[in-house]
Amino acid sequence: MYYYLITLAVIALDQLTKWFVVQNMEIGQKIEVIPGFLYWTSYRNDGAAWSILEGHMWFFYLITVIVIGIIIYIMQKYAKGKRLFSISLAFILGGAIGNFIDRVLHQEVVDFVQTVWGNYYFPIFNVADASLSVGVVLMLVYVFVDDRKTKGIK
């Protein structure tokens, strides 16, 4: 059940960083953290990742509740004893709940992490988004490793 602690840590870090941004930055304000690469940029998003489906909050409520339920079910039924699988689900669950809290309480999500590579500005994101991405990457690694084990490949 350690994976629920990971989920709680992700939610706490996500909500704490968003609270800090809301309390200390104006929307649109940018603070350079690593020159030419990393900025804290206060932004509000009422859509999904990269502002997809902006303004369709009812859709996100429904989908998120379903996804959270499915993840908890899978964690309870299948994740025990599968460390990488359970950790990946914990990161996904923490990210989903972190952004869901924002949508329910504020009808928008606080984003603030902005990275720049040369002339490319990656879409602004938050800890929950990063957690979702880490969870998905870990899940892909788990599936690849598990598939190799199943087939007996070293």
Swiss-Prot record:
Biological process (GO), any one: proteolysis
NCBIfam families linked: lspA
Top-level taxon: Bacteria
Gene (name only): lspA
One Gene Ontology CC term in the entry: plasma membrane
Task of the protein: This protein specifically catalyzes the removal of signal peptides from prolipoproteins.
Organism of this sequence: Listeria welshimeri serovar 6b (strain ATCC 35897 / DSM 20650 / CCUG 15529 / CIP 8149 / NCTC 11857 / SLCC 5334 / V8)
Protein name from the UniProt record: Lipoprotein signal peptidase
Active site residues per record: D111, D129
Assigned protein family: Belongs to the peptidase A8 family.
InterPro entries referenced in this protein's UniProt entry, alphabetically: Peptidase_A8
GO MF annotation, one: aspartic-type endopeptidase activity
Cell location: Cell membrane
Membrane-spanning intervals of the chain: 55-75, 84-104, 124-144
Pathway annotation: Protein modification; lipoprotein biosynthesis (signal peptide cleavage)
EC annotation from Swiss-Prot or TrEMBL: 3.4.23.36
Membrane topology designation: Multi-pass membrane protein
Catalytic activity as recorded in UniProt: Release of signal peptides from bacterial membrane prolipoproteins. Hydrolyzes -Xaa-Yaa-Zaa-|-(S,diacylglyceryl)Cys-, in which Xaa is hydrophobic (preferably Leu), and Yaa (Ala or Ser) and Zaa (Gly or Ala) have small, neutral side chains
PANTHER family: LIPOPROTEIN SIGNAL PEPTIDASE
Keyword annotations of the record: Aspartyl protease, Cell membrane, Hydrolase, Membrane, Protease, Transmembrane, Transmembrane helix
